[in-house]
Each structure stands twice: as structure tokens, then as C-alpha cells.
A protein has these predicted regions:
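Short, acidic/turn-prone active-site loops that include or flank metal/cofactor-
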Residues: 16, 130-132
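PLP-dependent enzyme catalytic core of the Aspartate aminotransferase-like
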Residues: 118-122, 132-162
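Short acidic/glycine-enriched loop/turn segments that link adjacent beta-strands
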Residues: 22, 99, 133-136
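Conserved PLP-binding catalytic core of the aspartate aminotransferase-like
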Residues: 77-78, 88-122, 138
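Short beta-strand-to-loop capping motifs
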Residues: 30, 105-109, 142-144
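Short, conserved loop/helix-junction motifs that constitute active-site signature segments
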Residues: 1-5
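Generic non-transmembrane alpha-helical segments
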Residues: 60, 83, 87-91, 114-124, ...
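PLP-dependent aminotransferase class I/II
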Residues: 7-89, 93-96
């Protein structure tokens, strides 16, 4: 297997690991013997320009202090995710397994669009997954306890109104 790994390309986009979900920048690590393919890609040009914010993110990504912060934040992120999944269960929302710092949830609501609109009016923004082929589900980023409490409070107000 290790010999096969030498032929793989790696694509890295550290934006989500750094909590910078709106920043669009990535880099690729090519296999050692891929000079011809790398040249062909360079001749194609980038699919979109990387702004100064993306360059800054990629420039700092490999710094020891940044890597230490990412490593040290994993335990906190796991705790927040477990709490958020438990909250979804208490609200009666079904969730799908995920190893990422976001997950999918299906709120049990007769009026899904109305629920999303009501939550948005309360300041809670959930990504409707219909465009992913998953109608009735939302993508939820793992957020801190205060944000989870805000979701729960908004859900209770909306559920009480119906």
C-alpha cells in the first residue's frame, strides 16, 4: 500500500480546520514523478483567483503555532459536537453520522421551509440540503455551547408557537 500512496495527489483546504469557512483557498501536493502533470495544470491557470485572505491562511497553515492550535482544539470540538448531537436528539431531530466538524440533521417539522424561515428570523442559519439531494435535512456546523443554547431556545419558541 505505501508504494501506491506515492502515486496519489493530495488536496488540502485548511479553511474549515481553522474555522474560516468563507475563505476559499487550497493547495495540492503532487506525487514526486508528476512533473509533466504539474506543468499541464500550471498552464491551465487557476479556476479562480486566491485573494490576500486565502494567501494569508495558506501561508500560516503550516506554522507550528497554528498546527498546535488545531491539535489542541480537537478535544473541545469533539465535546461541542457530542453536545450538539445530544441537543438534536432532545429536539427530536434525526442526525446522520459524520467525522467532520459539521453534520446533517433532519428536523421533524411538518413545515420545513417555515421552520427554517422562523429560525432565520431568530438569527439561526441552517443550510438547507435540498440542493445536495437531501430535502428536509440541514447541514449544521459544530458551534460553541452559547450558539447551541440559542438554537435550542429558538426551537422551543417556534415549537411552542405551533
Amino acid at each position: 500500500m505505501p508504494a501506491r500512496l506515492d502515486r496519489l495527489w493530495q488536496m488540502w483546504s485548511p479553511n474549515k480546520a481553522l474555522g474560516m469557512t468563507g475563505v476559499r483557498a487550497a493547495y495540492a501536493i503532487a506525487p514526486a514523478d508528476a512533473q509533466e502533470a504539474v506543468g499541464a495544470l500550471l498552464r491551465l491557470g487557476s479556476s479562480w483567483p486566491v485573494g490576500a485572505h486565502g494567501v494569508a491562511m495558506l501561508s500560516t497553515w503550516a506554522e507550528p503555532a497554528v498546527q498546535a492550535w488545531v491539535r489542541d482544539s480537537l478535544a473541545t470540538l469533539r465535546e461541542w459536537k457530542a453536545a450538539q448531537l445530544a441537543l438534536c436528539a432532545r429536539m427530536g431531530w434525526q442526525t446522520l453520522p459524520s467525522v467532520a466538524n459539521y453534520h446533517l440533521a433532519q428536523p421533524m417539522a411538518a413545515d420545513f421551509a417555515g421552520l427554517l424561515a422562523g429560525l432565520r428570523a431568530e438569527g439561526i442559519k441552517l443550510r438547507d440540503c435540498a440542493s445536495f439531494g437531501l430535502p428536509g435535512q440541514v447541514r449544521m456546523g459544530v458551534l460553541p455551547p452559547a450558539s447551541q443554547a440559542a438554537l435550542h431556545a429558538a426551537w422551543q419558541r417556534l415549537a411552542g408557537a405551533n
